[in-house]
Amino acid sequence: MDSPKTLARVEVKENGDTFNVKAYEKAVKSYITKRKPLGEALDEEIMDELSVKFGIVDDALEDLFKQIQDAGISIVDKDGNPSPLALVTDEIEKEEVSDTAMDEIVTNVRIDDPVRMYLKEIGRYPLISLDEETKLAEAIIAGGEGAEFAKQMLAEANLRLVVSIAKRYSGRGMQFLDLIQEGNMGLMKAVDKFDHTKGFKFSTYATWWIRQAITRAIADQARTIRIPVHMVETINKLIRVQRNLLQELGRDPSPEEIGKELHMAPDKVREVLKIAQEPVSLETPIGEEDDSHLGDFIEDDVIESPVDYTNRILLREQLDEVMDTLTDREENVLRMRFGLDDGRMHTLEDVGKQFKVTRERIRQIEAKAIKKLRHPRRSKPLRDFM
C-alpha cells in the first residue's frame, strides 16, 4: 500500500466518508499482527475484514495480498490450500525462465562459481508445455510407480522458476545459492500438494510456495539477531521512504519527516531504525594490513582501570599497616563493622555475638579504635587516597 496512485483508485466510501488511508493501514497492521502467530490467513476473512470493509479492489487488492504474504503469512482457502485469489498476484512470465533470462542473471546478479555451475546444471532440463504439465500432475495423483518419476520431472522442469524468483530477493542478507535452496524446498512442497483440477497452472501455484519459503528464510536467517517477519516488512517500508526522502530533500530525513510519510510517531521511527541496525563483529579487521580489530579500540567501562586497580592495592596495603597498630580485638571489630575483608558490613549485634559481648561494648571498642586512627601519625598515610 505504498503507492498513493493505487489508493486513489479506491473510490468506495466507508460509512459515507471518504477513504481513510490511516484507518486502513492501521487495520492491515492489526490484522497482520493477529494472524502472524498462526502463519496463515483465510482468503474469505481478508475479504470480509479488509477488502469489503474498505472497498479494496483490483490492483489495491493485489497489493494487500502481497503485503500480507511478505509478512510471512500464507493466504489459504477454507480447505487449507493456497488461495486462488492470492495466486493471481504471482504470475511468472515464460520469458523469465528462458535461457536468455538465466544468462541475464549470471550477468546482473553477483554470483560465484557454485551458482554458475548450478545454473548450467538446471539448464539441461527443458521447460514443459501445459499439456505435459497436466499429464505429469495426473500421474502424480494416480500414484503407483510412475508418481515419483512424475514428481521429479515436474520439479526439474521448474527449477528455473525458483532461480527467477530468488533473484528478486538477492541483496537481503542471504547468499543467492541459499535463496535458491530455500526456494527449492518450497517447490517440492508445491509438487506434493498440486491439484491441476483447481484450474490454475503449476507455475502459478508453485510461485506461491516458493515465495513463502524464501521470505520466511530471510526473516529467520538473514540477520545475526532474528527480527519478526512483520517487523522486517516495517523496516523495509521505512527504508524505502527514507531513501525517497533523501532523493527529494538532498539530505538525510529526520525521524519526524519519515514519520509524517508513514503516519508513524517519531519515537516509533527511531525505535525501528535502531532495530534495523546490523550488529558489527568485534573481530572486524581495522587498518590496511588487518593487524588489529574493532574490539581493540572499544573501551570496557565495566572492568577496573589499571590506575584504579593500583590505587586499590596500595590503599589496602597502607590500611593493613595502620590496622596493625591497633589491638587484635579493635582491628577485628573494625574489619567486621566496615566489611574490610568480605565487603559485608556487620551490625553491632552481629559483632557482639561473635565476641560474646554486648552491643554497647562493641560500640565502645569501635569508637576507641576510630579515635586512634584519627591520630595524625596513623591517618597521614591514608589521606593521599582521599
UniProtKB/Swiss-Prot annotation:
Family: Belongs to the sigma-70 factor family. RpoD/SigA subfamily.
GO biological process: DNA-templated transcription initiation
HAMAP family for the chain: Sigma70_RpoD_SigA
Placement of sequence motif Interaction with polymerase core subunit RpoC: 178-181
Protein name according to UniProt: RNA polymerase sigma factor SigA
Compartments where located: Cytoplasm
Region Sigma-70 factor domain-4, residue ranges: 322-375
Coarse class of the protein's main subcellular location: cytoplasm
Record-annotated DNA-binding residue ranges: 348-367
UniProt xrefs under InterPro entries: RNA_pol_sigma-70_dom, RNA_pol_sigma70, RNA_pol_sigma70_r1_2, RNA_pol_sigma70_r2, RNA_pol_sigma70_r3, RNA_pol_sigma70_r4, RNA_pol_sigma_r2, RNA_pol_sigma_r3/r4-like
Task of the protein: Sigma factors are initiation factors that promote the attachment of RNA polymerase to specific initiation sites and are then released. This sigma factor is the primary sigma factor during exponential growth.
Xref: Pfam families: Sigma70_r1_2 (PF00140), Sigma70_r2 (PF04542), Sigma70_r3 (PF04539), Sigma70_r4 (PF04545)
PROSITE patterns: SIGMA70_1, SIGMA70_2
Keywords attached to this entry: Cytoplasm, DNA-binding, Sigma factor, Transcription, Transcription regulation
Segments for region (Sigma-70 factor domain-2): 154-224
